[in-house]
Amino acid sequence: MAEVHVIGQIIGATGFSEGSLFCKWGIHTGAAWKLLSGVREGQTQVDTPQTGDMAYWSHPIDLHFATKGLQGWPRLHLQVWSQDSFGRCQLAGYGFCHVPSSPGTHQLDCPTWRPLGSWREQLARAFVGGGPQLLHADTIYSGADRYRLHTAAGGTVHLGIGLLLRHFDRYGVEC
């Protein structure tokens, strides 16, 4: 089977109004893909920017897939959360990006968004924290129901990804 190696890191995030940020991430693939090594999801540490608005995570990603075809190419889905001084966490943004399909190193910028909710939920978020969240995480990367959401823009997550493709020509898989 053809193989894909995804090696890189979640560098950090900019543009979020919240302070102490961390990122939950996961990778979604189609049925023809098999994870040979690595973990399918993870979480960064909390970083509070001291100067500027860049939260640095430098969280490693190292995945090795085998595939029979291109359908269901890997997508990286992200959830950025903020943590207050009491340890309470609230959603700062959702985002996703496709893993590039060409070999080499790539710098990706993944914009994020969060659901707004009703005016009461927005008011409660401003004073108490929390706020609306998605019931199903697959809504992040499937556009079927996403068009009905009222959202607010979040910040941007920065990723550095290196991609290695192996045996694509041997198994007749064309990129």
Swiss-Prot record:
Compartment list: Cytoplasm, Cytoskeleton, Cilium basal body; Cytoplasm, Cytoskeleton, Cilium axoneme; Nucleus
Protein name: B9 domain-containing protein 2
GO MF terms, alphabetically ordered: gamma-tubulin binding
Main location class: cytoplasm
Tagged with keyword Hydrolase: no
Known function: Component of the tectonic-like complex, a complex localized at the transition zone of primary cilia and acting as a barrier that prevents diffusion of transmembrane proteins between the cilia and plasma membranes.
Keyword Nucleus (UniProt): yes
Domain of life the protein comes from: Eukaryota
Coiled-coil residue windows: none
Keyword terms of this UniProt record: Cell projection, Cilium, Cilium biogenesis/degradation, Cytoplasm, Cytoskeleton, Nucleus
UniProt family annotation: Belongs to the B9D family.
InterPro entries reported for this sequence: C2_B9-type_dom
